[in-house]
Amino acid sequence: MTSHAVHAPGTTTGDALDDNRWTLARPGPFGVLLTATAPGTPVTAVPVPYLRDLARRHHLVALRGFTAPADAAALDAYARTWGEVMEWPFGTVFDVRAHQDPEDHVFDTGFMPLHWDGMYVDHVPEFQIFHCVAAPGPAEGGGTLFCDTTRVLADADPETLERWQGLTLRYRNAKVSHYGGLVVSPLIEPHPDAGFPVMRFLEPVPDGEHIINEPTVSIDGLEGEAAAAELAAIREAAYDPRHRHTHAWQQDDVVIADNYTLLHTREPYRRGLPRHLRRVHVLGDPPLPSHIHDHHGTTGAGTQRGTT
């Protein structure tokens, strides 16, 4: 299977842009890091078509040292220059930070399953746009780990790949905050625009871990040890160092992630440390329908198509 990911180190011809206000580097097995060289350069100085192209080819784009959007309204306005933004019951901008008494693991500081965004609502966003308002120290955890599923599939042996192509998984989560329901999804499906294969996977909670509002994960046609072994194999491949990269947040980082291709999770960190991200979802064109089958047990309104 051919991977869409760019495996060679360094930049490609298409990455070049004649502007000396930033440099471009490859911080991990995938993704690019743009670092401002001129103080006060706003993130809006980097053309969105250029960033969109980088995000679609490298799947993860981080901007560091730029003047970031000043507040949630400014982040919303910036995201709208990318396209149609997703509306949630809370609005368009989600404050990703720990709650004192969390009702869901999203608002906690410990283990979080690897997942893709939009799985429990009507549409899967193409991009996540993050702004880091505050971050723990470099050695204090709290990074966001991303898995490039094109690399997982490119490195799978033919027998494993054939087996995985026939798998359908079921995920259920009670809706105690802004998401929940039943999702029935193939493990592998084509990228909606480019056609290369990507994975849809919500990691089961490992033995020994406990999270608030734990999801259930099952595989159609497999039970017991057979299902557990398959889920463990998928998880092991996702966390292979060749397939993952952790973005260690710094204040005012702006990150664009390709949610069609990547999975992601939060690295645990100690409660009380400063970690505050803002996130906006940008829908594809046309928006990609999710694999949600029902919203059983949901509360409140669901997501809506956004506005530009």
Where do the language-model regions lie?
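A short aromatic-anchored loop/beta-hairpin motif
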Residues: 67-70
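Short active-site loop/helix that positions an aromatic residue
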Residues: 77
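Classical protein tyrosine phosphatase
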Residues: 74
